[in-house]
Amino acid sequence: MKTDIQTELTQALLSHEKVWANEEKTILAKNILLDLVEKTDPTIIGLLLGNDDLKRHFFVEVNGVLVFKLQDFRFFLDKHSINNSYTKYANRIGLTDGNRFLKDSSDIVLDFPFKDCVLNGGQSTEEGEEIYFKRNNSQSVSQSVSQSVSQSVSQSVSQSVSQSVSQSVSQSVSQSVSQLYTKLTRKRQEIFFNQTLAFDEIDRLFDAKAFSKFSRYTADGKQAVGEIKRHSDGTPAENLIIKGNNLIALHSLAKQFKGKVKLIYIDPPYNTGNDGFKYNDKFNHSTWLTFMKNRLEIAKTLLADDGVIFVQCDDIEQAYLKILMDDIFDRDNFLNIVTVKTKIGGVSGSSEGKSLKDSTEFINVFSKNRERLFLNPVYQKTEVNEFIKNYEDSGKSWKYTQVLIDLGEKILLEEKDGFKYYHYPNAQMTSIVKFSQDQNLSKEIIYTEYSHKVYRTTNAQSSIRSKIIEDLYSIKNGIVSIEYIPQKGKNAGNLIEVFYNASNKDMFMFLSDMLIKEKNKYFYLQKVNTLWDDIQYNNLNKEGGYIDFKNGKKPEALLRRIIDMTTKEGDIVLDYHLGSGTTAAVAHKMNRQYIGIEQMDYIETLAVERLKKVIDGEQGGISKAVNWQGGGEFVYAELAPFNETAKQQILACEDSDDIKTLFEDLCERYFLKYNVSVKEFSQIIEEPEFQSLPLDEQKQMVLEMLDLNQMYVSLSEMDDEQFAGCLNDDDKALSRAFYQAEKKDGE
């Protein structure tokens, strides 16, 4: 039933076209209305002032001036909207003309209607589907259902118990119940907490949370945690693996790691329904974007000023994700989109003939502050003769075609300002073709065994070449060189000699400088570009000590490249979609500090077990390449659960009696949504119709009553009597130590 104020507000806004979600003007577009009042839209404010009741309710006079009570208006809209924490525009992204969604308009402008929302993202079911119920209020329907259920139950008792009879009774009961409850199915509806509403709830949602179940894992096994180790600047120095909702965990970590993380890599659920992770990977389009937005916003605050974030995605949401990240990190801080060639995924069934085979994924790369960013040079490697063949097959001319046979006599010409100039008047040079003929060697052998003699020349401009041209202008025969110690670059601090053709002063570049030798093979090194097609995505089963995670694993080589490019030893790496633990495992092997967050139960069977094997020295993945010998440690902890515990208890119920008993406990011990009618449900739970519903459907109805704001225990409330049993004294002490919080008097 509408309140008087609701009615007055509805009437007052009828003349304003923008604030209605439907043509009938029966549903207010709450987000649009709030956006307008926050901008102090003169038309809206005028309409509110024009109604005496609304004026009295939402304005206060201060020194003769009427001041709009924005907070009160927000709270009013929240309190009187459908389901309170749900919005009228739930699970929908729109293309708008500024007033209406695309389906109502022919003009197109991309818009995210949930830009002011927070998606909690309770990822507890793999299928991403939920069932909800709409009760039919007709008394005649209720009587009919009761009679039908009674008859069905009587018949089932009198007949012999057989499968066919049981199925018949079940069908009869279900059909009867369906007359009383309309059963509806939808993609799982994520809960939105609108930031412009119910600020007390939002503050509680993002409060620092207490931790429980601390454990330290070392080469000696699992141990108790005695302290939280710290760097000299006070930042925790522990490798951390945290179980819990990643949005809540990120807000908690921000209290200690704000501006400290050098690299964030995430491989989130792709919104395809095909991901191996047990997330709700069937998010509605806007739900997925909001899910990403909320986490990216808080993750940005953790990044160091010279930090960088890599977000991997497939082509389903790539375009939208890029726009979202442009908004959060600023387009000026966009670096690249890296295309990663993965194993080829086939198309079959209904997709056959309707799409191309999917063989790539994309990584969006953004910096926190592009002006402060420096990416370390990282190289792709290809067997040298294979590289040359591919290079020539592409129609390009291979440049390394000369051989320096012998330098001959070395004459010091001059020494000044830390530079030595030399002349090699008798240097012998020839083409690689003639050298091959004279030495009876194949080009393949020359390119490998004689790579230190194979060269090309270049006229690339540099300050050193300018010195050569100026100081040795008169010398035109043989080779000249300059010897010095560079102050920066890859050879900084080392004595080097650079050679030039005396006639034109072009610089010598030797093939050996572009090669690396591994296991008696020579590989050509090429700076990585935005196409990464050299990383093996197949046969990952041996990585991580045979950790089984079929569709979720990323190659350790992929993470090594990203970590090499963006960090140095000791830097902090964060992955808040940890999954099988690849990021943490690679960071551990590369001596980086890391934080991994995962809320699914498999964190203990996958990520933790994988890291234990890393400590033991497992030799899969990048281990041999980085000479990993084992060692190190990490700390495991969980966000201390409260309503999360209630959720697990609901899921563990075995029959209706368990649910009934538990519901009484829920009302006394746990937080339920403030709009839940406990009295009404206490009556419903006694009805035969409800008890005849499938057990999973009964559980679902109870689960939806839990207040998601209270899934975990806040640090500030962990000593409250209501949370007794959620944490022990050691948990509380370590939680305080983590946040560097003082124990209050009397605690």
Swiss-Prot record:
The keyword Transport does not apply. The keyword Zinc does not apply. Residues 267-270 are annotated as: Binding of S-adenosyl methionine. Pfam families: N6_N4_Mtase, TypeIII_RM_meth. Keywords: DNA-binding, Methyltransferase, Restriction system, S-adenosyl-L-methionine, Transferase. It is an enzyme of class 2 (transferase). PROSITE patterns: N6_MTASE. One of its GO terms (biological process) is DNA restriction-modification system. Its EC number is 2.1.1.72. One of its GO terms (molecular function) is DNA binding. It catalyses: a 2'-deoxyadenosine in DNA + S-adenosyl-L-methionine = an N(6)-methyl-2'-deoxyadenosine in DNA + S-adenosyl-L-homocysteine + H(+). InterPro entries: DNA_methylase_N4/N6 (IPR002941), DNA_methylase_N6_adenine_CS (IPR002052), N4/N6-MTase_EcoPI_Mod-like (IPR002295), RM_Methyltransferase (IPR001091), SAM-dependent_MTases_sf (IPR029063), TypeIII_RM_meth (IPR022221). Belongs to the N(4)/N(6)-methyltransferase family. Homodimer, also forms a functional restriction-competent complex with Res. DNA restriction requires both the Res and Mod subunits. This is Probable type III restriction-modification enzyme HindVI Mod subunit. It comes from Haemophilus influenzae (strain ATCC 51907 / DSM 11121 / KW20 / Rd). The gene is mod.
